[in-house]
């Protein structure tokens, strides 16, 4: 059993889970509160002792793990989601190499964490607005740009756009964790079986 691969698939599930909510809110205007809270909590837990601790528990990543399970078995129902995930994983490389942007984002996350503590809710609309604004001011200027498509009616609403951007920030945070755990795009070519086995272990 590869502990590092087990950790990598948890982080990858965090990416998939956050992006699934991006897709959902872009199409319907609504998201799943518990899943969004898990994503936002992960943004604030920058000094967590383990990947499980970043998300609260491995169980909190069950939706993302199921997405990975289906993807690896060619049973995914959303063809856009893998493309979004690839864009975020590529964006992570550009982000971590931009020290100025990393510092600005870290400072903004600290401020949003204090706001979340005062409000008692990491997914409060004001917190989502702060994190969404932070993403717009910093990460959205990096390339490749993550393009989100959906229902124009909802994508024209400021609250929806803020939540989407906050979730993209959460997805990027998980991508950074994935890379820190040794993740690489080469895994999808040369370690696919190990990834599948790790996902299956996590879902047991």
UniProtKB/Swiss-Prot annotation:
Query: According to the UniProt entry, where is the signal peptide?
Result: none
Q: InterPro entries, alphabetically?
A: HflD (IPR007451), HflD-like_sf (IPR035932)
Does the keyword rRNA-binding feature in the UniProt annotation? no
Has keyword Cytoplasm? yes
Membrane topology is: Peripheral membrane protein
**Top-level taxon of origin:** Bacteria
Q: What is its main location?
A: cytoplasm
Listed SUPFAM superfamilies: YcfC-like
Q: Which UniProt keywords apply?
A: Cell inner membrane, Cell membrane, Cytoplasm, Membrane
PANTHER family registered for this protein in UniProt: HIGH FREQUENCY LYSOGENIZATION PROTEIN HFLD
- Please give the name of this protein: High frequency lysogenization protein HflD homolog
């Amino acid at each position: 059993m590869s502990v590092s691969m087990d950790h990598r698939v948890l982080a990858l599930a965090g990416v998939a889970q956050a992006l699934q909510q991006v897709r959902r809110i872009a199409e319907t205007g609504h998201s799943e509160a518990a899943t969004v809270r898990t994503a936002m909590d992960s943004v604030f837990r920058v000094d967590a002792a383990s990947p499980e601790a970043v998300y609260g528990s491995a169980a909190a990543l069950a939706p993302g793990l199921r997405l990975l399970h289906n993807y690896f078995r060619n049973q995914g129902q959303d063809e856009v989601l893998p493309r979004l995930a690839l864009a975020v994983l590529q964006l992570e490389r550009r982000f971590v190499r931009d020290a100025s942007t990393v510092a600005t984002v870290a400072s903004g996350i600290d401020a949003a964490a204090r706001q979340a503590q005062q409000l008692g809710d990491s997914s409060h609309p004001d917190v989502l607005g702060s994190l969404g604004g932070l993403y717009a001011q910093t990460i959205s200027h990096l390339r490749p740009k993550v393009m989100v498509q959906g229902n124009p009616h909802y994508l024209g609403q400021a609250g929806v756009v803020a939540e989407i951007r906050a979730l993209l920030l959460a997805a990027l945070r998980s991508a950074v964790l994935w890379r820190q755990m040794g993740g690489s795009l080469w895994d999808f070519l040369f370690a696919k079986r190990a990834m599948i086995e790790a996902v299956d272990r996590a879902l047991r």
